[in-house]
Amino acid sequence: MVKALLVGSKVLVPSIDESRYLYSNGFYGKPIGISKPKGPKDIVRPLELSLIESVYLTKKGLINVVDKNGDLLEYKKLYEYSAMKINKFEILYKVYEDLREKGFIVRSGVKYGADFAVYTLGPGLEHAPYVVIAVDIDEEITPHELLSFGRVSHSTKKRLVLALVDRKSEGIRYIMFKWVKM
């Protein structure tokens, strides 16, 4: 079991071997100080995991997260902690977990103005073909918001996907947009 340390809103994997293992088995995390690793051989520094990744990996039984006191954070406790730290965590986590379970590689999409950048092969092997924005299905989206979502995805040649999360049924509907010139 990989040992990880909770530090604020990040989780660190100090062991290089364990960092390499996580990265090579799903492209989890980012090595500290290495902006674009090409593969597991480039993982020569500790790995930094997001809270969303950490909750997922804890649920899958792949990592043990401990706090600054050395106390183990079980899945439920880490989930609750993350929900306090991250706005709309429940919705983001549902989408992250669903996409991972479907076999996609899911990374932060902040630099694209989205919640997630989604890969079929992985970072370093391809450019992310999709950007995903997670939305509560009951939340209204204005036409202006929709256009702003699409602006970045269009300029970076990525497909925009809205993930509509229904909290009642726990289902997720995905809508992909294709922008055309007229």
UniProtKB/Swiss-Prot annotation:
Residues the record marks as active site: Y119, H127, K158
Entry GO terms, CC: cytoplasm
Enzyme Commission no: 4.6.1.16
GO molecular function, one term: endonuclease activity
CDD domains xrefs: tRNA-intron_lyase_C
Catalysis performed (reactions): pretRNA = a 3'-half-tRNA molecule with a 5'-OH end + a 5'-half-tRNA molecule with a 2',3'-cyclic phosphate end + an intron with a 2',3'-cyclic phosphate and a 5'-hydroxyl terminus
GO BP of this protein: tRNA processing; tRNA splicing, via endonucleolytic cleavage and ligation
Source organism, top-level taxon: Archaea
Signal peptide: none
Key words, A-Z: Lyase, tRNA processing
Recorded coiled-coil stretches: none
Assembly notes: Homotetramer; although the tetramer contains four active sites, only two participate in the cleavage. Therefore, it should be considered as a dimer of dimers.
Family to which the UniProt record says this protein belongs: Belongs to the tRNA-intron endonuclease family. Archaeal short subfamily.
Chain's role: Endonuclease that removes tRNA introns. Cleaves pre-tRNA at the 5'- and 3'-splice sites to release the intron. The products are an intron and two tRNA half-molecules bearing 2',3' cyclic phosphate and 5'-OH termini. Recognizes a pseudosymmetric substrate in which 2 bulged loops of 3 bases are separated by a stem of 4 bp.
HAMAP family linked to this entry: EndA_short
PANTHER family named among the record's database cross-references: TRNA-SPLICING ENDONUCLEASE SUBUNIT SEN2 (PTHR21227:SF0)
Protein name: tRNA-splicing endonuclease
Taxonomic source organism: Saccharolobus solfataricus (strain ATCC 35092 / DSM 1617 / JCM 11322 / P2) (Sulfolobus solfataricus)
